[in-house]
Amino acid sequence: MIIKRSPQNPILKPLREHGWEAEATFNPCPAIKGKDIFLLYRAISMPHYHNLARNNIITSDIGIAQSKNGYNFFNRKKFIIPEKNWEQFGCEDPRVTKLNDKYFIFYTALSKYPFQADGIKVGLAISKDLKNIQEKHLVTPFNAKAMALFPEKINGQIWAILSVHTDKPPTKICLVSFNKESDIWSEKFWNNWYANFEKYALPLQRNKNDFIEVGTPPLKTKYGWLIFYSYIYNYFSPNRLFGIEAVLLDLKNPFKILARTEYPILTAEEYYEKIGLVPNVVFPSGAFIKNDWIYLYYGGADMVGCLALINLRIFLEEILKNDEKKPKLERFSHNPILLSRQENSWEKKAVLNPGAIYLNNKVHLIYRAISEDDVSTFGYAQSSNGYHIDWRSDQPVYIPRESFEKRDNPNVSCGCEDPRLTKIGNKIYMGYTAYDGHIPRIALTSINVKSFLNQQWQDWAKPILISPTDLNDKDMVIFPEKFQGQYLIVHRVGYDIDYSFSKNLNFGEGKWLEENRWIYCRPGWWDSKKLGAAAPPIKTKKGWILFYHGISENNVYRVGAVLLDLKNPIKILSRTSKPLLEPEMPYEKEGLVNNVVFPCGAVEINGKIFVYYGGADQVIGGATIDLNKLLQIFKTDKMY
């Protein structure tokens, strides 16, 4: 998704000299008045003695600040303070909408201390000029938060969105419509509505263990009402994840969901989102549109106010695009292209994860084969058109030769796994995972191109280990060119994709791959748990394409890609927001390891990219994508 944090972040910070906003200033919501932008925000005071609480507590007021540009704010002052008994312990999290020349400011009103669900309700302040408050009302007679009006009437009615039962889950994000303004604070109206509130809920929750809450007041676009909301994954777990998502509702019938994001567009990554009163929080609270850009305001770690910018046009195109129409890797119609052969003991159990290289107008595959007794070796196959296998070896072309790829216990697996092939000069380098039943490490060997083409497999060089001792390291690929006189090697220690530069390919005791963390997992996404490079990068006029596999929290393997700068490939230009390939076919969903697509090879032939992958750790499949279509995806998913 196209989103970038403001370099001025955090745009709103506590002021120690203002006791009422000395602890935190967050969850800001903007309102436009003339040429100025006013920001309403929650302000937390220094601890002080509260007569009604009979205790030293911190309290919340709602502040207001002014700006000419949306990120530099001045003239900060209190705006909404606890005055009524239904808000006597604090006013929190404002959401402001201008309707009929008045500013309707909904906020969380706290009436009880210690805080409890039946004392947490929605309050409303109405202002004509953002200087003074003309009216205040208690809105909901039940536990609710995060209410906001739509900025215009729909079918002659006033509409609003709110979160019901935020403090006694499950929470519902609901819609409500009013015939007249006074209905907004009518207790009778709300009691009738509340009796069947669940029928007014939007189905946004994916899992019963997740938590949702309204974020921004609705934004009108030509395609629909756009609302950003908080989606908290695994809310009741210590590993909960705060994310920001979005939904697009029909302009005339807001109950109709036109589109929504599949993954969070923002999670806590920056220090001001990770460190605060409540760590690791991003919480959307307000937005406006200017010059085709969405200015999205959010709270960071319940401490500061922040701003992110989103390209409106591209964002809407992305969430509205039908997944079936979006370019993806297209499987060969005759998949799987390689199966295990029961007559060959060395590949009887499975064939999978092929490396690929294009030489002399043929695609050459070196694939992993697993024997009955769980020893992995490499087989060979070739194709003249990239789609169909013309010939396949009857014997393994590479076997475990060194102690670091042989087992000392017959009850564990071992061998040579997951080959990747790169041609540099007149040599083909093959990196693979060497496994002795204890620690998987990266091994490197090579063979002369002529020997490879002549299938003189005895010419493979003696393999060497290039990853550190006692460190789990896998998924190694080498760039086919040097950069400033150095080789660039991609590998994986832990969960992210790493890189290492080396002046040469001579490794051994005292010289191992370095771990420079590079491409990270994206929390809440399809690649949230673990990443690994798939195939050696492909050079194009727009940059290097590096395919990778990503694993989700429910252990599904999918395929994505990044576009890297031609001269400085450490610089990531773009990353696919959606998977290019995911387990859908029976041979990908069921096997030795279910729900796996795992490429180790990719080649470009006449403007088309061929990707070769293992399916469910048992068979081999192929898929293609037009190079220009993939580059267009990268253009959409451009990173800032």
Where are the regions a protein language model picked out?
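Electrostatic interaction modules used in gene-expression and signaling proteins
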Residues: 287-289, 602-604
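Beta-rich carbohydrate-recognition and catalytic domains
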Residues: 1-23, 27-89, 98-148, 152-210, ...
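C-terminal structured domain segments
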Residues: 280, 594-595, 599
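Short Gly/charged-rich anion-binding patches and loops
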Residues: 532
